[in-house]
Every structure is written in C-alpha cells, then in structure tokens.
From Swiss-Prot:
Organism (species): Salmonella typhimurium (strain LT2 / SGSC1412 / ATCC 700720)
Protein name per its UniProtKB record: UPF0047 protein YjbQ
Similarity field: Belongs to the UPF0047 family.
SUPFAM superfamilies linked to this entry: YjbQ-like
Length: 138
C-alpha cells in the first residue's frame, strides 16, 4: 500500500533543527504499516534534510558553524540575485541533500538511538518548508 501527504514545517531561523517529532506528528493518522519505507522529499533548493545527533543541541550549533565557515555568505558567487545567503544555501542543500529514505516497522520509524531528522535551514529568512512524505509498506 502507498500513502502520500504533503506536510508544511513551521518557519525556522537559519541553522539546523531537530524535526523528528514535527514530522511524526504531521504524519499521525496514516494507517499503520507493519514493514515499510518512508521517503521524505524537501521541496526547496535552499534547505536540506539529514540524519544526525538527536540529543545534544551543541552538535547542531557546531554543524552550523562548520557550514558557515566552509561555505561563507561573503564569497564571490555569480548567483547573488536573492542576497548573500542565496548561493551558499544552494551549495549546502546539494551537499547535504533534500531527501531521506527511512525504514518503518510496526508503525514506527526505525532510527538509531541517537539519530534524529534534521532540517538544515540555510537562508536567513527561509519561511515555511514543504515536504512530500511517501509511505510504502504492508
């Protein structure tokens, strides 16, 4: 069986945000799947999805500092029509990716003990973000 839903994440400031609970809350009400896969596709080119540490928020802060240093806003980019944070946001989105494929068992995501779903908001003012969630399973 296949199920699909478009969900909208609340607006977040620039940085990395743990969104596991927000995702699972917005997917509540879907029929339970004994064994399956959840595919998440972020419909934006200036944000990203990744799995990482779900407990210590300093990991998210360190990750943001790393990417601000590695892909700075003030570099000489040709694509700068939407501001200094636009092209760096596209680069970070491409490096980290915009989709995740996650196993589901007995109606629950099967993540490691310390794993959580992160949204990387790479724009200073990114706005709400849309994700297409596709659940396949039996």
């Amino acid at each position: 069986m296949w199920y699909q839903r478009t969900i909208t994440l609340s607006e977040k400031p620039r940085g990395f945000h743990l969104i596991t609970d927000e995702i699972t809350d917005k997917l509540s009400g879907l029929p339970p799947v004994e064994t399956g896969l959840l595919h998440l596709l972020l419909l934006h080119t200036s944000a990203s999805l990744t799995l990482n540490e779900n407990c210590d928020p300093t990991v998210r802060a360190d990750m943001e500092r790393h990417f601000l240093k590695t892909v700075p806003d003030n570099a000489a980019y040709e694509h700068d029509y939407e501001g200094a944070d636009d092209m760096p946001s596209h680069i970070k989105s491409s490096v980290l990716g915009v989709s995740l494929l996650l196993p589901v068992r007995q109606g629950r995501l099967q993540l490691g003990t310390w794993q959580g779903i992160w949204l990387g908001e790479h724009r200073i003012h990114g706005g709400p973000r849309k994700i297409i969630a596709t659940l396949q399973g039996e």
